[in-house]
Amino acid sequence: MSLDKKTIVEAAARIADIEGISKVNLTVIAKELGIKSPSLYKHFNGGIEELNKELMLYGWHLLECEITKAAIGKAKDDAIIAICNTYRSFVLQHKGLFEAMQWYNMYQSKEHLEATKGTVAILFQVLEAYGLTEEEKVHSVRVLRGFLQGFCSIESHNGYGNPIPLDDTFNFALKTILNGISDLKK
């Protein structure tokens, strides 16, 4: 097996999704890859801190690819619904990776800012069709991000206990947000 950064990050993502992000460390990754942990320092001389950063970047890149695919050929509400459902599915399939993606400061470096820029840009692009002002688009993106990150984070930690189906709640919240966006232009 050829050992490179991508292979190591993908192994870390698998471990995070199966065991949880707290279980990701160089020893566990080395065991998963069938190597000795000092071999990982060749690729990550910053150790686990550097690996965590790469894991965050990897997760945001994957999410951007998924929501881009979901939005293609759709407009307005249909595009936003597709993006939101894809985001939610991504989180449920990649709970550990999603957790790694949350602990970043997007203004820490240009690289961090670029990591989230694509997903945000897609939302801004879709919102163009609503004829919103720049300020209204910023507010709309913030509301959508807050809803998605909050709802999906709580759901991924099994934080909802009510017997009403979560799909119904997710769709209700999304419909409420979409109605609010549409009402901006009435």
State the predicted function of each range.
Residues M1-L3, K185-K186:
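N-terminal intrinsically disordered/low-complexity leader segments
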Residues T7, A11, I15-E50, E54:
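Helix-turn-helix
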Residues I8-A16, G59, L63, Y87, ...:
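Short hydrophobic clusters on alpha-helical segments that form packing/core surfaces
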Residues A100, G146-P163, L178-K186:
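Amphipathic C-terminal alpha-helical segment
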